[in-house]
């Protein structure tokens, strides 16, 4: 992790830790139903104000909290067109395997690349600090993987170009 990312990730970690105070809350409309309020938004008093933590205009996190759920949406760093293509392919690969991640949503919030949904059942079954650590580690790993893929792609392109130009020499 680069030192420039540390304050950004610490801010996200602290905000997630503070907002993980979820509790069981049954539906006010249908008896014995418990749906994540951040998704259904049946009543305004149960949904808190969303928080956006941005490092720049392309790299930001949206944290939406309600009484029984929290939705974390991440926009991945995209500095050029190669990053955009790699991020899109990588996110699509992960979303196809969303059931393996438990808290990963198949469809992200509009304007973001990837989203997580944590409900009170997740916080009852798992440690809250481990959930926060997973999300932060996930963000670090995505950045690292995309950077590695970009380096590999550039090296491969350089090799292909040099082999092609050897034919003209």
From Swiss-Prot:
Component of the Arp2/3 complex composed of arpB/Arp2, arpC/Arp3, arcA/p41-arc, arcB/p34-arc, arcC/p21-arc, arcD/p20-arc and arcE/p16-arc. Interacts with carmil (via the region between the LRR domain and COOH-terminal proline-rich domain); carmil is required for Arp2/3-dependent actin nucleation. Arp2/3 complex, MyoB, MyoC, and the alpha and beta subunits of capping protein all form a larger complex with carmil. Functions as a component of the Arp2/3 complex which is involved in regulation of actin polymerization and together with an activating nucleation-promoting factor (NPF) mediates the formation of branched actin networks. Seems to contact the pointed end of the daughter actin filament. The Arp2/3 complex is involved in organizing the actin system in cell motility and chemotaxis, in phagocytosis and macropinocytosis, at late steps of endosome processing, and in mitosis. It is found in: Cytoplasm, Cytoskeleton; Cytoplasm, Cytosol; Cytoplasm, Cell cortex; Cell projection, Pseudopodium. Belongs to the ARPC4 family. This is Actin-related protein 2/3 complex subunit 4. GO terms for cellular component: Arp2/3 protein complex; cell cortex; cytosol; pathogen-containing vacuole; pseudopodium. The keyword Iron-sulfur does not apply. GO terms for biological process: actin filament polymerization; actin nucleation; Arp2/3 complex-mediated actin nucleation; exocytosis; phagocytosis. Gene3D superfamilies: 3.30.1460.20. One of its GO terms (molecular function) is actin filament binding. Keywords: Actin-binding, Cell projection, Cytoplasm, Cytoskeleton.
